[in-house]
Design a protein with these regions (language model features):
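Extracellular/cell-surface secretome signature
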Residues: 1-127, 138-163, 169-180, 185-187, ...
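Conserved aromatic beta-strand anchor motif in extracellular beta-sandwich/beta-rich domains
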Residues: 130-132
């Protein structure tokens, strides 16, 4: 019979990541050990950005855009707040506060001198800070970090032990990978602490030197701070 010949040519070239990818979030699933890393994230799309790369537990590949100008949306962390109870077993709740600034108020009054965990959530990975006074200087001038520090995450919390018979306003700002939200109006966490006698014994939070630490040779005692 008739014989036909076809010639195919192949060239090896560097991988070109797709211009726009919806697969950035698959990075951890594709990584051999489940930990996303920079080169793998970048290979999934030109719009893919690795965040929290210094911490393998929180490393994440997100779909970014230089045209993203939307600030993180801040909401109460409902499960965290409502999962706590006062010393009488009453569950805490919150009411949304509208206006400027908007936020939430915690009910009932918080127990004094007992740790309370405050929290907010964001609709995208972000980092958050708070102040006890309203300032207009922006995110990076705020004093207090949440427990997550500079990590870009969606769940944010911090724990405080506060004196009784006080009213508090905490002003929160959060920024995303592109610093959106830096100068936005803050989110308000409003609450009061119970007016009650202080019957709580002191709690030792830390010591220096730490328990079990080594001391210099031939030293039998050392000051404890």
């Amino acid at each position: 019979g008739d014989r036909k010949t076809k010639t195919h040519s192949f060239t090896c070239a560097p991988w070109q990541a797709p211009t726009r990818s919806d697969n950035c979030e698959q990075c951890s699933d594709l990584a051999p050990d489940g930990t996303c890393y920079e080169s793998l994230c970048r290979s999934l799309g030109k719009n893919c950005e690795l965040i929290n790369g210094e911490d393998p537990i929180f490393a994440e590949c997100i779909s970014g855009s230089i045209n993203d100008v939307a600030p993180p949306k801040i909401t109460p962390w409902a499960e965290l707040i409502q999962g706590q109870t006062d010393k009488f077993g009453v569950s805490y709740s919150y009411d949304v506060v509208s206006g400027n600034p908007g936020g939430y108020v915690i009910n009932p009054d918080i127990d004094s001198l007992i740790p309370f965990n405050f929290g907010v959530q964001t609709n995208e990975p972000a980092q958050c800070r708070y102040d006890t006074e309203l300032n207009t200087s922006g995110y990076y001038e705020m004093t207090h970090e949440f427990d997550q520090g500079s990590l870009l995450v969606k769940d944010h919390n911090f724990t405080l032990i506060l004196p009784g018979n006080q009213d508090y306003d905490f002003y929160v700002r959060c920024v995303d990978f592109y610093d959106n939200g830096e100068n936005d109006p803050p989110f308000l966490i409003k609450f009061s602490t119970k007016d009650e006698p202080d019957r709580q014994p002191p709690i030792i939070l830390s010591t220096d030197p730490l328990s079990g630490s080594s001391v210099a040779y031939d030293i039998n005692q050392t000051p404890v701070i």
